[in-house]
Design a protein with these regions (language model features):
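Transmembrane beta-barrel wall of Gram-negative outer-membrane proteins
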Residues: 33-108, 125-130, 136-137, 176-180
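C-terminal beta-signal and adjacent terminal beta-strands/loops
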Residues: 34-35, 388, 613-704, 729-775, ...
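Extracellular/periplasmic, surface-exposed regions of secreted and cell-surface proteins
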Residues: 10-13, 42, 77, 83-92, ...
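Aromatic- and acidic-residue-enriched carbohydrate-binding clefts of CAZyme catalytic domains
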Residues: 219-231
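A generic structural motif
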Residues: 65-69, 355-357, 512, 601-602, ...
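Residues embedded in well-ordered regular secondary structure
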Residues: 1-71, 109-112, 138-156, 160-170, ...
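Conserved small-residue
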Residues: 1-23, 273, 278-290, 494, ...
Length: 784
């Protein structure tokens, strides 16, 4: 912008331009420090309990406050939980529980993502001028004007994220109430009835306000031309939502032992549940935060208002309020049977059918069931000689079916009403588009599951091993597929896919230290899961879609990087052996370079924990690890060559080549590149100006981003120390002198450190622009 002599830089000499270019380098803003803070939270709980042989009670009061990670954000919550259990006679038990909570959150409206802004904003931009006023960011929304084009105008005061945080707000108030009643009646000695009834009510009210001088308000001016008008007005979006739900369950339970060797337990019951949710919203322009009133903007006095403009104005007003209603109902009937012979052989059988109004009329009920077998080998006589070192051994297997409801689809025709009406002299007609075509054959997703597991204990259970092998197959999974446009739709979601998961999991728990004063335990587990798409009926299924039969979900299909061409400065890729490369079209066809490179879902995962204690002092830690997950480490910049808005001469294959992403902040290693004068092959590829010199890359190699992204593919394996906790419980004889029943203090750290070769910010959340925050917690527990 400076060298081009554009705008306020017009007429500057080279020396003056040099001075202007050098000036920003004299200042560096750490935007993460400006926008974020060390969050301090506190939580307090007080509980009371007591009772007699026939009745007990429990009451808990809680308060928590969290000053958010983002400045100007905070969260408060008040809660009360109570429970009373009554036993009026030997046959009847009753209980009633009530939980209430009220929470309040405050923050900015979030019209601009502060995490993304902090990552990409240029460090030479300033949050404030020397006089304390807001300093306008000259680059974040100005890539077009910086390159001689025409940007959408900004407010006269410019864009400044600190102003957005100070003069926009999002206030949310939430109240929830849950009532639960249960009853158990011993009808006979071995027959009982168990019932449960619950009711929940949740209400949420939010106000989203944008001050008139903010960029958020500037972007939301439906009554004005965005290019010619400079008029601004504040706005507020207010919404109110409530949800009420219920659950009723009743079951008969019979159990008995015969001849001291047969034990049987059976359940027969049913359950109904449902929910009703309603949401109402309204938006007001010209809102005054002092009085709470609003004055809706009208066209300027000298504006010629024809019928078309009047219709547009009415359409805007019509869309300023609305409501939505959701209602769901479910019914279930179930039966279970457990049989134990000689405490060695166990059989479990379950059967149930569930019904939902989320499916077609003849598909609403889904029968499922399971069968399980277990053998307690350690109860056999031949096991006696082994008990000196193996204390327990059991073998279990199970087979069954379950059902799942995919709430993203509906059997009914769903219409999205637009925010305007078609007006006539006599009436107004709603206008909408069909979002979801009817599907009376929509049905449950069904999963067949079988498992085989082994449990073994050694040395009086000081060491315990569990191993499990499983196979899980889901049929009628809902997938979005392309359909013939003659149907009136380009795609539709219905029951079309079959998925399969196969895996093993091993866990080991041990007590390695056990004396009068010392104790120590450790555990670790590792799991391997392989999933694949067995069936997918779609005309567009293929490698390029990332959805292909025989491959895992989350598959990554891209190119195999061979290195940087020293002559051209671009990445070259391995060619598929089953295709020919005779023409430029062959060399540019991305499918000729496409390979399966792995999956974003790591096949190996696990965790570990360690606990060591000495008398009342205890130290524990825990963590997790993941092996061989893959991720394209490419955080999309808010700007690129397309943002300039001109016709390109040469298409950069991927963001890593694009000159115009350097308009905003980039990684330090972006300067390490191949250049014609320094043809490095151990750094980043060349910079490509989409509007500069024609290179003709597509004559040599594919320009597809799908292939070019392979250069940013990384392994996101990691090992993480997730938590570290130190606690101390004061000696009972000591605290009694203070009139206390118990006293303990604790200190906990979370998200401590991660070991990884991933070059991004956080391998646990790859692609994020801010890592999971490290947390420190100090706690005190007092009992009276």
């Amino acid at each position: 912008m400076i060298r081009s002599g554009y705008g306020k830089y017009a007429g500057l000499s080279k020396e003056e331009q040099d001075a202007e270019i050098e000036r920003p380098g004299q200042h560096s803003t750490n935007w993460f420090d400006e926008l974020f803070r060390n969050s301090v939270s506190q939580s307090h709980n007080l509980s009371l309990s007591g009772g007699s042989e026939k009745s007990t009670y429990y009451i808990s009061l809680g308060y928590s406050k969290n000053n958010g990670l983002v400045k100007k954000s905070e969260y408060d919550r008040y809660s009360i939980a109570s429970k009373i259990d009554i036993k009026p006679n030997k046959r009847v038990k009753m209980g009633l529980a009530a939980d209430m909570g009220w929470q309040r959150s405050r923050g900015s409206s979030g019209s601009v993502d502060p995490f993304k802004y902090a990552y990409f904003a240029n460090p030479y931009e300033r949050p404030y001028n020397d006089d304390g006023s807001y300093s306008a960011d000259r680059t974040y929304y100005s890539i077009r004007s910086a390159n001689g084009g025409l940007d959408l105008p900004l407010p006269e005061v410019g864009f400044n994220l600190m102003r957005e945080m100070d003069h926009t707000s999002l206030k949310d108030n939430n109240f929830n109430l849950t009532l639960i009643g249960n009853m158990s009646v011993n009808i006979l000695e071995n027959l009982s009835f168990e019932g449960l009834a619950s009711f929940s009510y949740v209400t949420d009210n939010s106000d989203n306000f944008n001050g008139k001088d903010t960029y958020a308000a500037w972007q939301d001016r439906p009554f004005d031309d965005p290019f010619t008008s400079k008029r601004t007005y504040s706005n507020i979006m207010q919404s109110s939502t409530y949800n009420r739900s219920y659950n009723l369950r009743g079951q008969l339970h019979y159990f008995n032992t015969f001849n001291d060797i047969h034990y049987i337990s059976t359940l027969l019951g049913s359950e109904i549940r449902g929910q009703y949710a309603k949401s109402i919203f309204t938006k007001r322009y010209g809102y005054d935060p002092v009085t709470g009133n609003s004055a809706i903007p009208i066209y300027p006095e000298d504006t010629s208002v024809d019928y078309e403009k009047l219709q547009r104005y009415a359409s805007i007003v019509d869309g300023l309020s609305g409501q939505s209603i959701v209602e769901d109902k479910f019914a279930s009937f179930y039966f279970s049977l457990d049989y134990v012979l000689l405490k060695r052989y166990i059989l479990s059988f379950t059967a149930r059918t569930d019904g939902s109004n989320n499916f077609g009329n003849d598909q609403q009920f889904n029968p499922t069931g399971s069968l399980g077998l277990a053998w307690n080998i350690d109860q056999e006589k031949f096991f006696e000689p082994l008990k000196k070192w193996m204390s327990s051994l059991s073998l279990r297997s199970s087979f069954g079916y379950t059902g799942n409801i995919n709430k993203s689809v509906s059997p009914k025709l769903i219409m999205d009403y637009l925010g305007r009406l078609r007006q006539t002299d006599e009436c107004s007609y709603r206008i909408g588009v069909i979002k979801n075509p009817p599907n009376p054959k929509l049905r449950w997703e069904k999963t067949r599951d079988w498992k085989l597991s082994l449990d073994a204990g050694f040395f009086n259970e000081r060491l315990h091993f569990t191993g499990e092998f499983y196979n899980r197959r889901t049929t009628d999974a809902v997938s979005n597929v392309k359909v013939a446009r003659t149907t009136g739709f380009s795609d539709q979601a219905y029951n079309t896919s079959t998925l399969e998961n196969t895996g093993v999991e091993f866990s080991l728990t041990g007590t390695f230290l056990k004396t009068k004063d010392w104790r120590g335990t450790a555990s670790a587990n590792i799991a391997y899961n392989y999933n694949k798409l067995v069936d997918y009926n779609s005309s567009v299924s293929g490698l390029s879609t990332g959805v292909h039969k025989g491959y895992p979900l989350g598959s990554i299909f891209s190119g195999k990087v061979q290195g940087i061409d020293p002559q051209l400065g671009i990445y070259t890729y391995e060619r598929r052996p089953d295709v020919s490369f005779e023409t430029a079209a062959d060399r540019n066809n991305y499918a000729n370079y496409l390979f399966y490179l792995g999956t974003s879902n790591a096949p190996w995962n696990g965790g570990y924990s360690l606990s060591v204690g000495y008398k009342q002092l205890n130290l524990s830690l825990g963590g997790s690890y993941s092996i061989n997950g893959k991720k394209i480490n490419n955080i999309k910049s808010p700007v690129n060559y397309i943002s300039v808005g001109s016709s390109s001469v040469e298409t950069p294959p991927a963001q890593i080549y694009d000159l115009y992403v350097n308009h905003l902040n980039v990684r330090k290693d972006a300067t390490e590149r191949w250049t014609p004068t320094n043809p490095r092959t151990d750094a980043n590829p060349r910079i490509i100006d989409a509007f500069g010199e024609f290179i003709g890359l597509k004559n040599y190699i594919t320009s597809s981003e799908t292939i070019a992204n392979a250069s940013m593919l990384e392994n996101v394996s990691y090992c993480k120390l997730s938590s570290l906790s130190l606690s101390y419980g004061f000696n009972e004889s000591l605290i009694k002198r203070w009139g206390l029943g118990s006293l303990a203090v604790s200190f906990t750290m979370n998200n401590i450190f991660t070991i990884t070769n991933y070059s991004g910010i956080d391998p646990e959340t790859p692609g994020a622009v801010y890592p999971l925050a490290r947390q420190f917690t100090f706690g005190v527990a007092v009992g009276l």
